[in-house]
């Protein structure tokens, strides 16, 4: 099973992004596949980014951002993942010296996806996920 990172969904939604067409094309290529899972945590992060004026020159309204997230949630071919009993592990990693505070989102996302059987992960930030347990982590924007 495979999943994809928030950054690809953000590029796909952002027409001003140099990676817009490629990200959108990648996500559209997954639309009918039955081996794709998306996580509610990723969608929460997407909602936050869609409304962020530092990312979008014209951020989406609350209703527009929810509509984008709902479109992902409503794909009947994909498995929708909510949460998993991973937080003891996540907190243990987060307590270690040198743990970057924003990394907690990536670690929780990875652990949740792995718990639900995801083995492949597409992201524009391969380095951030390379050692989190997936069999394959790749950047579809460079392949």
Residue spans of the language-model regions?
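Acidic, PIN/NYN-like endoribonuclease modules and their adjacent C-terminal/linker elements
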Residues: 1, 107-143
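Hydrophobic helix-cap positions at the C-terminus of alpha-helices
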Residues: 29-30, 72, 93
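Short, well-structured N-terminal submotif of metal-dependent ribonuclease cores
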Residues: 1-38, 53-67, 131
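Aromatic- and histidine-enriched alpha-helix N-cap/loop-to-helix transition segments
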Residues: 38-44, 104
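Short, hinge-like loop/turn segments at secondary-structure boundaries
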Residues: 53-57, 99, 139-141
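Active-site neighborhoods of divalent-metal-dependent phosphate/nucleic-acid chemistry enzymes
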Residues: 77-124
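Alpha-helix/helix-capping structural signal
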Residues: 7-8, 41, 85, 108, ...
């Amino acid at each position: 099973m495979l999943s994809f990172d928030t950054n690809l969904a953000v590029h796909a939604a952002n027409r001003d992004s140099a990676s817009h067409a490629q990200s959108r094309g990648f996500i559209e290529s997954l639309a009918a596949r039955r081996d794709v899972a998306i996580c509610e945590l990723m969608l929460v992060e997407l909602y936050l980014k869609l409304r962020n004026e530092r990312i979008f020159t014209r951020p989406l309204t609350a209703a527009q951002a929810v509509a984008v997230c709902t479109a992902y949630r409503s794909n009947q071919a994909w498995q929708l993942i909510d949460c998993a009993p991973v937080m003891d592990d996540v907190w243990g990693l987060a307590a270690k010296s040198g743990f970057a505070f924003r990394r907690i989102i990536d670690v929780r996302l990875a652990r949740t996806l792995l718990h639900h059987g995801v083995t492949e992960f597409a992201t524009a930030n391969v380095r951030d996920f390379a050692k989190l347990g997936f069999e394959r982590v790749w950047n579809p924007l460079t392949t």
